[in-house]
Amino acid sequence: MSFTDDHDHAACQRPLERVRPFDAAAFERAVADMLTASGIAIDPIHTGKTAQRVRELWQKRLLDGYDTVPAEALGSGFADERRDMVVIRSLAVHGMCPHHLLPFRGVAHVAYLPGGRLHGFGRIARMVDAISHRYTYQEWITHEIARTLVEHGEARGAACLIEAEQLCLLMGENRRGDERVITQCYAGDFETDAEARNQFLRAIER
């Protein structure tokens, strides 16, 4: 997997945390200013409600992950002695690249090896949303999903593979438009158990 220079963020592993509350009024003013700076007049027919619409989309769908702690979204699950691998294929996932403020979207394949607790599938999906609906990178999301299942979900191991379309890549110069980025992370027993990794990869094959 290769990235442009803009994706040279391997040395920085800290999430981009929110340092103050979302300011809806300031956000709408910024969108209106961007339209004006682009040379576009704000008129009642086409752009009069654009600032409000953009703010609602960003606040409610693109950045709503900041309103939820991933571990709380996952919850504690329930006690269960089963140890067989649990795999969820093709969870919708999207995030916002902080470099160009362009979204990326794709699917996340998630697996975990229970360590005494099972977790609801909806809970896992909400955890993925809490992790990804932020200013973030695909690599960080992949790592954080696996890490959260092990550290907070008490899983013996966890795996995550994400395949996504990165608009900052797709819209670059001389691109074909069908590029995809694949990232994967293995935590806990998955790191040392090659058979578990292979079983996971077989399970998510289309």
Swiss-Prot record:
Assigned EC number? 3.5.4.16
Which terms in the GO cellular component ontology are assigned?
Answer: cytoplasm
Keyword set, alphabetical order: GTP-binding, Hydrolase, Metal-binding, Nucleotide-binding, One-carbon metabolism, Zinc
Residues that hold Zn(2+) according to the record:
C97, H100, C168
Q: List GO molecular-function terms, semicolon-separated.
A: GTP binding; GTP cyclohydrolase I activity; zinc ion binding
By its UniProt entry, which Pfam families does this protein fall under?
GTP_cyclohydroI
| One annotated GO biological process | one-carbon metabolic process
Reaction it catalyzes: GTP + H2O = 7,8-dihydroneopterin 3'-triphosphate + formate + H(+)
**Pathway connected to this protein:** Cofactor biosynthesis; 7,8-dihydroneopterin triphosphate biosynthesis; 7,8-dihydroneopterin triphosphate from GTP: step 1/1
Q: Which domain of life is it from?
A: Bacteria
The family database entries (PANTHER family) matched by this protein are listed as: GTP CYCLOHYDROLASE 1 (PTHR11109:SF7), GTP CYCLOHYDROLASE I (PTHR11109)
The record's comment on protein family reads:
Belongs to the GTP cyclohydrolase I family.
Q: How does it assemble?
A: Toroid-shaped homodecamer, composed of two pentamers of five dimers.
Q: Which HAMAP family match?
A: FolE
What is the protein name for this chain? GTP cyclohydrolase 1
According to its UniProt entry, this protein's organism is Chromobacterium violaceum (strain ATCC 12472 / DSM 30191 / JCM 1249 / CCUG 213 / NBRC 12614 / NCIMB 9131 / NCTC 9757 / MK)
Q: Which gene encodes it?
A: folE
